[in-house]
Design a protein with these regions (language model features):
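Extracytoplasmic/periplasmic proteins that interact with beta-lactams or build/remodel peptidoglycan
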Residues: 57-67, 72, 135-143, 148-174, ...
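Peptidoglycan glycan-strand catalytic modules in the bacterial/periplasmic cell-wall system
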Residues: 64-275, 491-495, 502-506, 518-520
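Bacterial peptidoglycan biogenesis and beta-lactam-recognition machinery
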Residues: 104-117, 130-136, 187-193, 205-211, ...
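A penicillin-recognizing enzyme superfamily signal
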Residues: 342-363, 372, 384-388, 393-423, ...
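N-terminal type II signal-anchor transmembrane helix
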Residues: 1-69
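Short pre-catalytic segments that frame enzyme active sites
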Residues: 78-87, 213-218, 246-250, 330-334, ...
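Structural recognition of the beta-strand scaffold that forms the well-ordered cores
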Residues: 104, 139-146, 197-200, 229, ...
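Proline/serine/threonine-rich low-complexity "mucin-like" segments in extracytoplasmic/periplasmic regions
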Residues: 707-781
């Protein structure tokens, strides 16, 4: 609007509009609304009517901002999300006392006028012309219009529009009043009185700060009850707040609110809504507040599910069905009144949270991260998600770096995670699946002797060649076992055996298998993504031993495929979404699909069940049939894993440095404390968690045995030579992604392209299993 300094007309216009307002008594506004029996006498009045008639006659009413609620699978609440804390309810769920109190104090002639109360306008206009104080004169319908206009501006982040909707001074104030009057009449024609009253009670601000909108949210905030249960004095208090929510905030100004409440009680008595006895009893009472919080967002998530909550929020933020932009999607969550039922199992989540924090406590001086995620085979439903940090949505102070984070260690960057972690020997099942897909057997023999694999020996058909000479080693740089079966190489996680297997396969096919099983880099890029130098990590020979960086949730979903006869189901954290009207909204996610032949999946599952029988997961049994794989990168990289599954649960457990690389053989004072393998920390957590979690599920039967063709003997050791590595290209010299210490696991010293990455150690437990006991935590004193 043009300011008075730049335009001399506003003073005249203000006077004119004031005249229009006062002239309503004489019928000018009424005439403009074609109210029978009212005439127009003057040219000025005619002009006023013309201006009035030119005002907008249709009120745009959007859905009110209403809080959304996230639920666990059993219907228990995880968190609320809101821009305005509001829950809309129909009029029959609002007490009659609340309806009466509102009408008595705000518009006692509500059921008599048609949206504009000429008597009220006249009274207010005359008062305002002769007094230094002002009266409003607005009907309840006009107030509703004002709130709708402000709400619309809020939804558009239009601050000027909000101010304009509430302007009360000068020309702008009179213009607003006229606009409201015109629109109020339109509203009265559109709705009956009860509908208008219902909408009014749902849109009002009943606090100021914290924001409480609508009578249902207000009833819960101040007394922990529903709007239908509000009594006389409670209703009077709420009705009195509306005049000035900030000044009449019960939590900040109880004395002023009590005085205002009693004024409302007087109005209720005056207009016959309560008896003298009811009035006398009500004014003697206090406010008797029983404040109930409605936490907003994932920080206050229940069931220790803050990181899962944040994951679900990011699933919504990434889905265009909730809005064109991220901002639109956030608005849908905070204003849409959604009910989001998730896959989280609260009982299993509690077990996960307890076991993760027991093994590596929050604030452990080592700074080690420890995380777990569980997926249901056959559905992809995310059952539990935990890590040894407190969730925060703000910046983390340096002193709290080992205690708090806003990063979810189990997911990718797209879902507020990190860049992922090297997975070590948990990558080997992808090599094994490719081996079986190519028609080879679990009983085929491979040459596990430590040796160099020249760049020229690697096979690439259909993708870029990333090979370099490679000289992988086993745990402790020990010698290989010579000829061994693929089953034994898997059972004991022998790096050199798997290098020989990979050397016989098309590296492109290994990468394709991993991609079919849902594996991406933690950055979110596909596995065939090339960096600035053109290097593709997932095609490097060292990737056979796990130098690829991905996420625990992706690995859990991939391993679930082995338990589910080759059918892959991507992570699915949301079961159902309903809008404010109870209508179903499409749930983000893809359908499950068959990505491996059933027999191939069964072959991999069978091999992984054998790791419990004298292999790298010996001593980690959980009392039901299970398959598992340990994983350890080289100590300088510092990530250890346990991936394992039953027919009902697939769980990934990770331990490592979330901020970079760290040698976990050293404690906080730099002293060597011993080797850390996948079975040492991650394995213990997996065992403790799964042994309890499987009791919460049904159907943990054994796995179907694969076809006999996968148990036929034969095969050869494949390429390689005794020459030393050349540190060339992606293959690296002395490389590997780590191995598993069992009967010959381990890794090399480098890999990953040059001298980096790779593995120098493994996962262990060996034949006697378990990796030994350890005190909770990894740090120093």
């Amino acid at each position: 609007m043009v300011s008075p300094e730049s335009n001399p007309e506003p003073t005249k216009m203000a006077a004119f509009l004031q005249f229009v307002a006062v002239s309503a008594v004489a019928g000018i506004v009424a005439a403009g609304l074609a109210i029978p029996g009212v005439g127009v006498a003057t040219a000025s009045a005619n002009s006023a009517v013309e201006i009035f008639n030119a005002l907008p006659a249709t009120l745009e009413e959007r859905d009110l901002g209403e809080k959304s609620t996230m639920l666990a699978a059993d219907g228990s609440k995880i968190a609320d999300f809101y821009w305005q804390n509001r829950v809309e309810v129909p009029l029959d769920e609002i007490s009659q006392e609340m309806q009466d109190a509102t009408i008595a104090v705000e518009d006692y002639r509500f059921f008599e006028h048609g949206g504009i109360d000429l008597e009220g306008i006249a009274r207010a206009a005359v008062h305002n012309m002769v007094s230094s104080t002002t009266q409003g004169g607005s009907t309840l319908t006009q107030q509703y219009v004002k709130n709708v206009l402000a709400e619309n501006a809020h939804a558009e982040s239009n601050r000027e529009g909000v101010e304009a909707a509430r302007e009360s001074e000068g020309t702008a104030g009179y213009a607003r009043k006229l606009r409201e009057a015109k629109l109020a009449v339109a509203v009265e024609k559109k709705y009956d009185k009860k509908e208008i009253l219902n909408r009014y009670l749902n849109i009002n601000n009943y606090s100021g700060s914290p924001n409480v909108y609508g009578v249902q949210a207000a009833a819960y905030r101040y007394w922990g009850i529903d709007a239908k249960d509000l009594n006389i004095q409670q209703s009077a208090m709420l009705a009195g707040i509306v005049q000035n929510p900030s000044a009449f905030n019960p939590e900040r100004f109880p004395d002023a609110v009590l005085e205002r409440r009693n004024v409302v009680l007087g109005q209720m008595l005056k207009y016959g809504h309560i008896t003298q006895k009811e009035y006398d009893e009500a004014v003697k009472t206090g406010l008797d507040l029983n404040i109930k919080e409605t936490p907003n967002g994932c920080s206050a998530a229940e069931n220790s599910a803050a990181f899962f909550c944040n994951y679900v929020v990011n699933v919504i933020k990434n889905d265009e069905s909730f809005g064109k932009t991220v901002e639109d999607r956030i608005a849908t969550l905070q204003r849409g009144g959604l009910t989001i039922k998730t896959s989280l199992n609260p009982d299993i989540q509690k077990i996960a949270d307890k076991e993760v924090k027991k093994r590596v406590p929050v604030g452990d001086p080592s700074g080690a991260g420890h995380a777990l995620v569980t997926i249901e085979p056959g559905t992809g439903e995310v059952i539990a998600m935990a890590q040894n940090r407190e969730y925060t949505e703000g910046e983390v102070e340096k002193k709290d770096k080992n205690k708090k984070t806003n990063i979810n260690y189990t997911v990718d960057k797209k879902h507020n995670g990190g860049a992922g972690f090297q997975v070590g020997s948990t990558w080997k099942p992808f090599v094994l699946a490719t081996w079986l897909k190519s028609g080879k057997s679990l009983n085929a023999s491979v040459n596990a002797t430590k040796r160099n694999f020249p760049a020229s020996s690697w096979k690439y058909s259909g993708c870029p060649n990333m090979a370099g000479d490679w000289d992988p080693s086993n745990a402790g740089d020990g010698s290989g076992k010579g000829s061994m079966t693929v089953l034994n190489a898997t059972k004991n996680s022998v790096n050199t055996g798997y290098a020989a297997m990979g050397n016989q396969l098309n590296m492109c096919k290994i990468m394709e298998t991993a991609m079919d099983l849902g594996i991406r880099y933690g950055s979110g890029e596909k596995l065939d993504f090339a960096d600035k130098s053109g290097f593709i990590q997932a095609l490097s020979p060292s990737s056979i031993l796990g130098t690829t960086e991905t996420t625990p949730i992706a690995m859990a979903a991939a391993f679930a495929t082995f338990a589910n006869d080759g059918e892959f189901c991507g992570p699915k954290p949301i079961l159902e979404i309903k809008d404010r009207n109870g209508k179903n909204i499409d749930v983000p996610g893809e359908e499950c699909k068959q990505v491996l032949d059933k027999d191939v999946a069964r072959g991999v599952a069978y091999a992984l069940t054998q790791t419990f029988k004298g292999g790298t997961t010996s001593g980690l049994g959980i009392g039901v049939p299970a398959g598992a794989k340990t994983g350890t990168t080289n100590f300088e990289v510092g990530h250890t894993w346990l991936l394992g599954f039953t027919k009902t649960l697939s769980t990934a457990v990770w331990t490592g440095d979330p901020r970079g690389t760290r040698d976990w053989r050293k404690n906080g004072k730099g002293k060597v404390s011993g080797q850390i393998y996948g079975a040492t920390i991650s394995g213990k957590t997996w065992q403790a968690f799964m042994s309890k979690a499987v009791k919460e599920t049904k159907g943990n039967t054994g796995f179907p045995k694969p076809s006999s063709k996968y148990f036929q003997g034969g095969g050869s050791g494949g390429g390689g030579s005794s020459s030393t590595g050349t540190n060339r290209g992606g293959g690296g010299g002395n490389g590997g992604g780590g191995g598993d210490r069992g009967n010959g696991g381990g890794g090399g010293n480098g890999g990953g392209g040059g001298n980096g990455g790779g593995g120098n150690g493994g996962d262990g437990g060996g034949d006697n299993g378990g990796g030994g006991d350890e005190a909770p935590g990894l740090g120093g004193n």
